[in-house]
């Protein structure tokens, strides 16, 4: 074999070794990536399996043609005022089963807001979300603080079983749910409370504006 041929053979061998090393490195990287993805997915599955799945707080038929969503905070002064004006009840009287109301938490007004939202969720486990919601708005001052005495007062007033209610709160069962609720509200365009959506569109929370939007959707 000539020197030229030997040089070419050596270059070819070196090139093959380089490709083999590169291929081996690429395979290792691929295995690491697959492992990371599998680990990530297993972590996500663990979270989703342990996360609390809470049913919606719905007042009205789930299949109503007009769906009204309220993003609100139990410490919110404007939410309390809207509730006590009776607009919801007036709309329900006017439109009946053609509308449904859904309450969604957006607890961002005070430091106590997330705790109130968690307490409402714990009350919902006993099918007492709406009585809890109504009691807070109708009996406490705006921006109420949350403490054991107030929670015991509500429990006695609306018929909550104290032990499971207190256990639910102590366990922090709805911590993640409340955090997710805030993100959901923001993704739906909520920037303050209350924020109302009628079939996905924000509407001013007056009786006139809301009834006009409903009539438009119903074609009446």
PLM-predicted stretches and their roles:
Residues 64, 69-156, 191, 215:
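Structural alpha/beta surface segment adjacent to cysteine/selenocysteine redox centers
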Residues 50-66:
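A short beta-strand-turn-helix
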Residues 54-55, 102, 165:
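Glycine-rich, flexible loop/turn motifs
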Residues 1-35, 71, 84-90, 153-220:
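C-terminal cap of thioredoxin/glutaredoxin-like
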Residues 36-46:
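Hydrophobic single-pass membrane-insertion segments
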């Amino acid at each position: 074999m000539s020197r030229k041929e030997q040089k070419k053979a050596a270059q070819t061998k070196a090139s093959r070794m380089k490709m083999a090393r590169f291929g081996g490195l690429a395979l290792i990287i691929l295995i690491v990536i697959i492992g990371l993805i599998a680990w990530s997915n297993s972590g996500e599955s663990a979270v989703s399996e342990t996360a609390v799945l809470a049913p919606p707080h719905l007042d009205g038929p789930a299949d109503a043609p007009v769906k009204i969503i309220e993003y609100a905070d139990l410490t919110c002064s404007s939410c309390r005022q809207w509730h006590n004006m009776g607009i919801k009840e007036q709309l329900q009287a006017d439109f009946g089963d053609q509308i449904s109301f859904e309450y969604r938490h957006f607890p961002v007004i005070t430091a106590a807001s997330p705790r109130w939202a968690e307490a409402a969720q714990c009350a919902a486990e006993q099918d007492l979300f709406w009585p809890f919601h109504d009691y807070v708005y109708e009996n406490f001052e705006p921006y109420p603080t949350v403490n054991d005495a107030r929670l015991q007062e509500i429990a006695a007033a609306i018929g909550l079983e104290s032990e499971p209610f207190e256990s639910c709160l102590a366990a922090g069962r709805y911590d993640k749910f409340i955090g997710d609720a805030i993100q959901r509200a923001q993704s739906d365009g909520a920037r303050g409370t209350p924020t109302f959506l009628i079939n996905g569109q924000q509407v001013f929370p007056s009786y006139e504006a809301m009834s006009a939007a409903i009539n438009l959707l119903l074609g009446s």
